[in-house]
């Protein structure tokens, strides 16, 4: 666990400055635990991203998802009935097993976003978490602005079409739930 957290810190250019282990006997079954973390950052006032300069014609740049991340796992568990699912099952759509695919580490976007900010005037950033595209993108937009996305241009990890097919989930619901 610590090695994985340390690798995440390296990818983000962050320091792991503390931590604690809360022992809660009787709360979790044996061999189970809960892990939570957060980051805090600082930025020069002149470099704060301010969407007030956003205007019609600005480009929307989508960074590709590495998979389900932490969004929609309740729905994933329901679709595959995870308690009874064979996580070692191979699906033609996936490059690995279902379990390997679902455990794909969440991509850390810090370095690509910072590199982009060196090249262009970034006017807004939206992380696609719970609520998917439909709730998160509007929060990043300036008043009176809308984003038009060409869904066919988005590179979607194969787990998402598989979830949609197996779960019989309408496409709008997929974009409202997952970070596709």
Residue ranges and their predicted role:
Residues 41-43, 60, 64-69, 77-80, ...:
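Glycine-rich beta-alpha junction loops
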């Amino acid at each position: 666990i610590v090695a994985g957290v340390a690798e995440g810190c390296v990818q983000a250019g962050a320091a792991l400055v503390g931590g604690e282990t809360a022992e809660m006997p009787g709360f979790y079954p044996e061999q189970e635990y809960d892990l939570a973390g957060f980051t805090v950052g600082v930025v020069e006032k002149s470099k704060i991203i301010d969407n007030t300069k956003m205007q019609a014609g600005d480009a929307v740049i989508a960074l590709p998802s590495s998979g389900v991340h932490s969004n929609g796992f309740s729905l994933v568990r329901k679709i595959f009935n995870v308690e009874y699912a064979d996580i070692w099952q191979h699906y033609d759509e996936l490059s690995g097993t279902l379990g390997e695919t679902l455990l794909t580490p969440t991509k850390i976007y810090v370095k690509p976003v910072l590199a982009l900010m060196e090249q262009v005037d970034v006017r807004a950033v939206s992380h696609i978490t719970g609520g998917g595209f439909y709730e998160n993108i509007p929060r990043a937009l300036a008043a009176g602005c809308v984003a038009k996305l060409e869904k066919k241009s988005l590179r979607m990890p194969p787990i998402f079409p598989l979830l949609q097919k197996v779960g019989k989930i309408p496409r709008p619901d997929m974009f409202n739930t997952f970070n596709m």
